[in-house]
Amino acid sequence: MHCSLNGDWSMQLNSTEISDLIKQRIESFEVVSEARNEGTIVSVSDGIIRIHGLADVMQGEMIELPGGRYALALNLERDSVGAVVMGPYADLKEGMKVTGTGRILEVPVGPELLGRVVNTLGEPIDGKGPIEAKLTSPVEVIAPGVIDRKSVDQPVQTGYKSVDSMIPIGRGQRELVIGDRQTGKTAMAIDAIINQKNSGIFSIYVAIGQKASTIANVVRKLEEHGALANTIVVVASASESAALQYLAPYAGCAMGEYFRDRGEDALIVYDDLSKQAVAYRQISLLLKRPPGREAFPGDVFYLHSRLLERAARVNEEYVERFTNGEVKGKTGSLTALPIIETQAGDVSAFVPTNVISITDGQIFLQTELFNAGVRPAVDPGISVSRVGGSAQTKIIKKLSGGIRTALAAYRELAAFAQFSSDLDEATKKQLDHGQKVTELMKQKQYAPMSVFDQALVIFAAERGYLDDVELNKVLDFEAALLSYARGQYAELAAEIDKSGAYNDEIEAQLKKLTDDFKATQTW
């Protein structure tokens, strides 16, 4: 090898010298270990931390912070990681060391959580001691595929006449409850949970961004009505960080999936997803993701679709495969009742339209109806159930066919009747019937009705037994009829509650019951 230096002299290097030089270099080389799952906080602001050095972190990974807290990795950038702190962040400082755990966020699941109030991470906040859950589950799970699903054909009774007759809900369905503030959305969901206390359906109530006093009231009501024992309450109140409010629905869903995947039935209420979307928008803007319509990030549709797709009815093969053959021949279901709050009845805003398009129907609650004393304030005109019809109890399905038609005709005629004074007999009769059906659909809170009670009341309305009852006496008539039936026809009531069947014999018995009651004139 020939090297020319300064052009005036040259030196020769032989192969031995070269190999010695290389050996020398190798011996003097220092190995500096680079911790790929350890990083340093470079900035802290508004619950968002930027971390330098976490090379091997995954999307959604738990990052351990000083003091036993965690952050969630959401932005994986070229030279830094953006993570959102779950919990208080005031004492975090630049330069602090953090560690990647290699785990996605998991929450405890199982029957041990029933009857308890927990936070987003599954930690008890009801002061009743620790929860000895044996299993945990990731909060983000891919929803069951098409092959694993089964069609919806079993009912979830809400206990509301208006819902069970016109907008029936099936096990594994997603039914949106939508309306302005103070229209009875939470009341409807809580009543649906109370009605499941003897149905074998487990319930999960997820409170997102609500006042702590409101949540305490809900828990007390569930306890008073004996429904807390088979309910899990997941709380991310208004005072919690945006990260916990964003994650709460997924945590609640993971707890519900435990029952679904083992051949049980569960009902989950998200109260409400508008607040979750706002929390997610806050996180996204702080992470400097580009805003879109109404300043929401581009993936706000996916935020809700991946959550609501996990509510499903799964078939026997899926359950058997999931439980390794322990549970055979049983289907499982998770029914979702997401709640969305609208502003001044605007259902065409971004988040409401998204959730309407994801769900299998919606129950629309109207402020005008609520203020007029029609409670629950269900608007039968724009409320639908896209898959619940095949899940409806046979007797309710047979009897309630005319209810929606009667109310639709009544609404049309009522608008017309305002401008016309001389109405013919048929129109007057239709208006009168519509008014009485509207009156009959009213129901008090915390008073869910059994299948028999609903069937009997609808039977009386449909067969003209209310025609000679004054409008202001309709609810008295209903109460007296039910009390009479429970006393005199207890066997029939038990049979209908159990089977939900409808045939000529049952029809004859209902007719005899109502005729006997009308003869007493005791309302």
Swiss-Prot record:
One of its GO terms (cellular component) is proton-transporting ATP synthase complex. ATP binds at G179, D180, R181, Q182, T183, G184, K185, T186. Coiled coil: none annotated. Its main location: membrane. Keywords: ATP synthesis, ATP-binding, Cell inner membrane, Cell membrane, CF(1), Hydrogen ion transport, Ion transport, Membrane, Nucleotide-binding, Translocase, Transport. Its EC number is 7.1.2.2. It is found in: Cell inner membrane. GO terms for molecular function: ADP binding; ATP binding; proton-transporting ATP synthase activity, rotational mechanism. It is a peripheral membrane protein. It catalyses: ATP + H2O + 4 H(+)(in) = ADP + phosphate + 5 H(+)(out). The record marks S383 as: Required for activity. HAMAP family: ATP_synth_alpha_bact. NCBIfam families: atpA, PRK13343.1. Belongs to the ATPase alpha/beta chains family. Produces ATP from ADP in the presence of a proton gradient across the membrane. The alpha chain is a regulatory subunit. This is ATP synthase subunit alpha.
